[in-house]
Structure formats: structure tokens, C-alpha cells
From Swiss-Prot:
This is Cyclo(L-leucyl-L-leucyl) synthase. Belongs to the CDPS family. The record marks 180 as: Could be involved in aa-tRNA binding(Leu) binding. Coiled coil: none annotated.
Length: 248
């Protein structure tokens, strides 16, 4: 594709805050961190354009969060050789970045405000938050099981996306793929410290079971007071999913 499509249809998004504190952060609309997943057909160029357009209209400042190199673990867990998995992730994240940059430029945002998990490996705030997550993972069985459950869902979802039949998900597969979950969690509990912003909301298109448990104080780790989570869904997609559910 050589250039941006100049005409886009009007679209509406519905935003739902995870907690009352998240709602209060949303009302102030200072900053949002838009999460974009790799290997997810939802995140087409048009969808990213619409989503970032909505975010830019709602918030004073918009940043975008893309996957890091840990995404290769998910592919490797499904049998892709490590080198090939890393190449596929680099290609996919580059595609996501390109679409996000175009959308930010088109809507008057900052095209440099795009980050991957891996960008913060040497960031002190990220390191501390990740250490907190890893400590809970190894010391609290119920938290570890919740993380591995998310890992299982990701493996099954990716397998379904490539029409791969999964008879079972082994422990080795889970332990390999869970690195992605661990790498992402610091942005769920304390992204403002990492990004050096006053407060933010991590925005994604669906509820996060692990995040709901964290917000319900089921584990030692918790969301910082200036951190929130926002479920952002496109009206057209919601109506389509509702129609499929009612017909099915």
C-alpha cells in the first residue's frame, strides 16, 4: 500500500473503565496507551486508523504499545523454529508500527510515541515493575496459575488463527509462552512510571481476566493509583458479534 486511504467511514467506539479509579482517570482524559496485538486480524490498517483517531479525539496525549521480542515465544511454543519466529515477529511488529505511525500523523499525534515491550529493558521503572511481577509469579501459586491460564488462551487462540489442531497444551509450551504475559504486565500495573506521564489508561478491545483479578486485589501486585485499564470496542464490531451470537 503506497499511501493512506483519504476517505474513511464514520465510526463510534464505546469505552468501559475497569474500576471506579479507572473511570476517574478516564474522565480527566490526560493520556492513553493504546495496545496493539501482533498476529491479530482485528488490527488492520483501517481499524488502527479509526482506533487512534478515536483516542486522539478523546485524550490530550496518545501513545501506542506494541509487542516485544517475547511474542516469538508464543510462535516457538507452537513449533516454529526460534529464528523463524523472531523474523515473523519483527515483520509483524514493523507492520503494526507503520500503520500506527500513519494514523498518528493523520490525526495530529506524535509518531514517535510508539513503544514495544523491548524498548524498556534498560528502563529502571520497568525493571522494578517486572521484578515485582516475576516475584509474584514464582512465589504465589495462584498468581502463577492465572498467568499460565492467560498463556494457554494465547496459545489456543494463535493455533486457531493458523488452523492448527491442538489436542493439549503442555507445561513446557505454557512456560515458554508466559514470558509474553510477564513482559506486558508492568504496563498494566504501572505504565506512568515507565512512560514518565502523570497518569494513563491502557486501552484494549476486550476484558483481561488476569487484569480483573489484579484489580480485585487477589494477588500481591496491584495497579498503581495513576494507572487504569479501558476496554474500547467499536460499535460496528460489537453489533456484528452480538448478531453472530444470537444466530449461533
Amino acid at each position: 500500500m503506497t499511501g493512506m486511504v483519504t476517505e474513511r467511514r464514520s465510526v463510534h467506539f464505546i469505552a468501559e473503565a475497569l474500576t471506579e479509579n479507572c473511570r476517574e482517570i478516564f474522565e480527566r482524559r490526560r493520556h492513553v496507551l493504546v495496545g496493539i496485538s501482533p498476529f491479530n486480524s482485528r488490527f488492520s490498517e483501517d481499524y488502527i486508523y479509526r482506533l487512534i483517531g478515536w483516542a486522539k479525539a478523546q485524550f490530550k496525549s496518545v501513545s501506542v504499545l506494541l509487542a516485544g521480542h517475547e511474542a516469538a515465544n508464543l510462535l516457538e511454543a507452537l513449533g516454529t523454529p526460534r529464528g523463524k519466529a523472531e523474523r515473523k515477529v519483527r515483520k509483524e511488529v514493523s507492520r503494526n508500527r507503520r500503520f500506527a505511525e500513519r494514523a498518528l500523523v493523520a490525526h495530529g499525534g506524535d509518531p514517535k510515541a510508539i513503544h514495544t515491550f523491548s524498548d524498556f529493558i534498560d528502563n529502571k521503572a520497568y525493571q522494578l515493575l517486572r521484578q515485582e511481577v516475576e516475584h509474584a509469579f514464582f512465589e504465589q501459586p495462584h498468581f502463577r496459575h492465572a498467568c499460565l491460564d492467560m498463556s494457554r488462551e494465547a496459545i489456543i487462540g494463535r493455533a486457531r488463527g493458523v488452523s492448527l489442531m491442538m489436542e493439549e497444551v503442555s507445561e513446557d509450551m505454557l512456560n515458554l509462552a508466559v514470558e509474553y504475559v510477564i513482559a506486558e504486565l508492568p504496563f498494566f500495573i504501572g505504565a506512568p512510571d515507565i512512560l514518565e506521564v502523570e497518569e494513563t489508561l491502557l486501552a484494549y478491545h476486550r476484558p483481561w481476566k488476569l487484569g480483573e483479578k489484579i484489580s480485585n486485589h487477589e494477588f500481591s501486585i496491584c495497579m498503581r493509583p495513576n494507572q487504569g485499564y479501558l476496554i474500547v470496542q467499536e460499535m460496528a464490531q460489537m453489533l456484528s458479534e452480538k448478531r453472530i451470537t444470537s444466530e449461533g
